[in-house]
């Protein structure tokens, strides 16, 4: 038994499931999770001393690679002044100004501590601004673990929300309606059903929590038109795509402007940071100046702001990174497609820039239903086979792979050889 197994045995006695976020448990894989000791660049090192090429990137924040020198130095410098003050600081103003100066659709922004908080707050603001209650989300799109967002489609698209977690009263979700991703007709049908009471449509501009599912051509533009037609706000959940696909996120990448946007992951550079922002007339409803209440003891924490602002400034000043990540994505995911073709395997690769997924299904994956057709047992064996070769990916068929600046062509080619080796067995 290795140290990871020993730690997991200890953890399950004092932490539910042995982890502090479910996907870390490797529950779908059937082995003990790797406990990580340190990370650098595109590599992580577990407590047993094993080295892995990492394609999780801490679930997205580490776009510059682990332990990036400028970010680390900014944190150490900020720590010298203290960890938290419970008062306003200069750096949270600098962070907000930087975002508003460089993201055209964000006039005002409020910092929070997670993507979940960002979504929860943005939905509340949308309801406050419109005076309406209904929210439309999409099956397979994850928007954090607030009660109103933990909803499945039930018996069909036209069904009002049914809680997808124990402990969530039906009353918390009855105003949440679930549409089919990439299906504008399903959205229009729900808006008609809501009879003018749709406050907002919230969407992952790139589905990244059912595996990676790109929007079909015209889908996001169609959502924009439907929201305008029915008097609803369009919320882009850019917790994953924000500052990753382009500096302006999916909104810039696809050329579609939301009314509100939520951020997480990259905005904190590995620290617990989220944010939501949008048009001034909407954001001015947020307390203390407006009637929509939202607060947080550690929101705008100076250590987290130092890390996040340093990373955002670096990304803005080096926007060639985004072209580089696009090319890395073509090299990795395109290379995987070639291997599947060589081996005559009917599986599918979806990718958008640095985000990608290998789906163990013969179907083209365009929504949650087609994603669920994947053979999760086959994925589990693939994950274990790649881990044995020193490649660390998300331990779930329904999570994304993330590339970072630190993934070199050489590392990507080594990864492709590992893929080829696995499918040659």
Regions found by a protein language model. Name each.
Residues 1-425:
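Conserved N-terminal phosphate-binding loop of PLP-dependent enzymes in the Aspartate aminotransferase
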């Amino acid at each position: 038994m290795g140290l990871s197994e020993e730690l997991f045995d200890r953890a399950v006695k004092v932490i539910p499931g042995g982890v502090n976020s479910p996907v870390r448990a490797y529950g779908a894989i059937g082995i003990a999770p790797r406990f990580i000791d340190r990370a650098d660049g595109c590599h992580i090192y577990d407590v047993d001393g094993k080295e892995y090429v990492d394609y999780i990137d801490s679930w997205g924040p580490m776009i510059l690679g682990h332990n990036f020198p400028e970010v680390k130095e900014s944190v150490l410098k900020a720590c010298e002044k203290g960890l938290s003050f419970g008062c306003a600081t200069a750096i949270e103003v600098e962070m907000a100004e930087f975002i508003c100066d460089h993201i055209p659709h964000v006039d005002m922004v409020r910092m929070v501590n997670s993507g979940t908080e960002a979504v929860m707050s943005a939905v509340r603001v949308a309801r406050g601004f419109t005076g309406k209650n209904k929210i439309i989300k999409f099956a397979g799109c994850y928007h954090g673990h607030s009660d109103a967002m933990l909803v499945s489609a039930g018996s069909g698209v036209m069904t009002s929300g049914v809680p997808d977690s124990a402990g969530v009263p039906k009353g918390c979700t009855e105003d949440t309606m679930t549409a089919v991703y990439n299906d504008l007709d399903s959205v229009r049908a729900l808006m008609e059903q809501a009879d003018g009471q749709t406050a907002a449509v919230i969407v992952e501009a790139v589905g990244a929590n059912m595996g990676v599912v790109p929007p079909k051509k015209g889908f996001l533009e169609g959502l924009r038109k439907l929201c305008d037609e029915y008097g609803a706000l369009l919320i882009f959940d850019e917790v994953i795509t924000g500052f990753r696909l382009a500096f302006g996120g999916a909104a810039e990448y696809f050329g579609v402007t939301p009314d509100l946007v939520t951020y997480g992951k990259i905005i904190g550079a590995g620290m617990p940071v989220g944010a939501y922002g949008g048009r001034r007339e909407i954001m001015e409803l947020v307390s203390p100046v407006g009637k929509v209440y939202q607060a947080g003891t550690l929101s705008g924490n100076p250590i987290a702001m130092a890390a996040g602002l340093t990373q955002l400034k670096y990304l803005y000043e080096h926007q060639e990174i985004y072209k580089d990540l696009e090319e890395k994505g073509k090299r990795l995911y395109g290379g995987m497609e070639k291997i599947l073709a060589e081996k005559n395997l009917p599986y599918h690769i979806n990718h958008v820039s640095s985000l990608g997924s290998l789906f163990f299904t013969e179907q083209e994956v365009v929504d949650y239903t087609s994603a669920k057709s994947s053979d999760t047992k086959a994925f589990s064996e693939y994950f274990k086979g790649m881990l044995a070769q020193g490649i660390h990916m998300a331990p779930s068929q329904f999570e994304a792979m993330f590339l970072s600046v630190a993934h070199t062509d050489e590392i990507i080619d080594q990864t492709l050889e590992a893929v080829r080796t696995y499918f040659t067995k």
